[in-house]
Amino acid sequence: MRWTRRLRLCAVGAVVASAVFSPSAARAAEPSANRLTGLVNPFIGTQNDGNTFPGAAVPFGMVQFSPDTGHNTGYDYTQKRIRGFSLVHLSGVGCAIGGDLPVLPTTGDVTETDDAKYAATFSHAHEQASPGYYRVGLDSGIRAELTATQRTAVQRYTFPATRKANVLLNAGQSLHKNVSSKVEILDDRTVRTEITGSGFCGPSRPYTVYTVTRFRRPFTAHGTWYQNSITRGATRSSGPGRNGAYVTFDTTKDRTVEATTGLSYVDAQGAAVNLRAAHVSSFDQPREAARRAWEERLGHVRVRGGNAILRTTFYSSLYRSFLAPNIGSDADGRYTGWDQRIHRATDFTYYQNWSLWDTYRTQCQLLSLLAPREARDMAISVLKIDEEGGWLPKWGYGTIETNVMSGDPVTPFLTHAYQQGLLKGYEERAYRALKKNADGVPPADTMYVGREANREYIANGFAPYIKDRPFSKPGDSDYHHGGSVTLEYALSDGMLAQMAGSLGHVADAARYAARSRNYRTILDPSTGFFRARDASGAFVGPADPARSEGFHEGTAWQYQWLVPQDLRGMVALIGGERAANNRLDSFFAYDRLLKDPARTAREVWVNGPYAYYNADKYNPQNEPDLTAPYTYLSTGQPWKTTDVVHAALTLYTDGPTGVTGNDDLGTMSAWNVLSSIGIFPVQPGYPTWGLTTPVFDRVDLVLDRAYYPRGGLTITAPGTSHTRRYIQGVRVQGTAYEHTYVTTDTLRRLGSLEFTVGARPSGWGTAPEAAPPALVAEQSAGK
């Protein structure tokens, strides 16, 4: 997502891995026997704009305590200076956000106030990370260690023997724009800050975070700064610009300094509440608790088979899938709603940070499978945004809407939650919010864009592409992406039609089903491809679908498969299965792929930095194509899905460049996890899971019995490998199964899903009735 996406380097993964994990490189913590956390490498994705972070967090925690090296999203593996360890990071986003309160240990006199000037040099040889823990030896001789609880950042610094061991707390510099800040030294152990920031991929409304930092022992000196002016002994500084504080310790006898920082999006009281609730008695206590939390979370999936690199990339992806959304409510249940008022969550945990254009396609499905209780609270939190703030979100950060990206991603996010049974007791409330969103446009005086082009879409059947239309609000504009927005709106309408019908809203269901076929309105009969239309209805932009305009971060070639609500109808529209398969083969460079899958993935699919446009090939690094490999399940050639998926999986490696593009809050990581275990959500917003060959001999899923009564699912594919990857047959609970998909209802009844694999394609799944059903089949049949 966004302009900073980088493409993977074309080096062979094994060579990259060998270089990265040489003794001179940063490393994941040494694996311990039977510990899944030892298989996670947090440095994966920290180079080439995967934009992940290597620091400390617990699953879905409010705090992500991690080093910032000067990269716009925090940490870049190629940079060698740390500006500070800050509290907030979003894994894999494409624009600067967070980075609040960078802290840094130093020695000597405090003479600089700009983190770019006082940044500490370091070497990857002295850097180590594992889930919930980060350590680095700075060239200054200071060792910094970080860990985290749900709402606190815990730090331990080991200094040389000196009377001038400092900790700098920089309230006035963040990754995003810092609007104003305040720092207060309350006593000889405590520092409090208030930080207001704004901006994510452009301007946004401001938001405020509050922190309280408590040191385990008193400091011997202190001071504050404003801009370039340092005032020794001062206890307060505030206003726009750089504000910060430093505290000094004598480490001639005790070289260790420990501190815990409570974070809140509510107020200073909330930060103090969160600090007390963490009950941190020593650094090692929360470090071990974080490790146990991750061990338990990762233990929901256990795999057998595969080599060491495959297991590392898999569990590292699983780890990143659990980093967001993030807890937004304090330990006392209070949270700041999108009306900027304080509310209290009494029977759920409030979550925030919604990269919905990305996560609705993979990550929310993975969480509904492996973390349904948290996923339920996340869905309820999204409903609270509507109830308190007035509209459903598009891309929410903290307490604000950023309006980043386009379309209507919240609808498939919530309809999926409904179909998974996560909204029991909230069904009609969710439907009312979704109906309002689907049929309207947010008022002009609100911060929401919503379905901005909805009036034209409902009236004419398509969202117009108006290239130079002025922005009505901060963020992206749906009018600037009319082609892809039409497809996204239609997808959402199809998913909402299923929910409406299930709830008995028959007329609404028919209306949304009819609208879900609006993808047809932008099919240019002269080219046979989708093409944006202007306000008058004329097709606009180059006729060449590889050079199309009006498609967000993609081309008409890449968006043509984004019709999960009626893929059969789409296939018929372009000439039937044979024509569709010819297009798919060209799209994936299938003949070349068979000869050299990894090279095709890196040299044909991946074309260079910012390669969103001017392409007629599959882009495995961006969201519009995430379901595209699974299209073959609906065209009678399911074995080709396995060929493409397994080739795409070679792009995930165990080094810093090992994430395919921005990870986007776990979206690309979740794609890896789901594709690796052989079940993938092919109709985002509806509980349909496509089947493909797992890369492991056996996968054991531990499932929540409240949602999956059997409490687990075992997926087997004995002998699966690069050469034996084709499905010969599937058995469900021991019974032969010919469909290329299963539903969530089927998964709830399953204890086992068995794949038999071989060296050549078979006839499995090739019958027309084996394909996933079109969700609007009856309505589309007569059109």
Region locations from a protein language model:
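Active-site and channel-lining beta-strand-loop segments
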Residues: 533
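Short aromatic-glycine motifs in intrinsically disordered, low-complexity regions
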Residues: 713-721
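ATP-dependent phospho-/nucleotidyl transfer catalytic cores
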Residues: 492
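Secretory targeting and sorting signals
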Residues: 1-29
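Accessory carbohydrate-recognition regions in carbohydrate-active enzymes
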Residues: 30-412, 418-487, 495-521, 527, ...
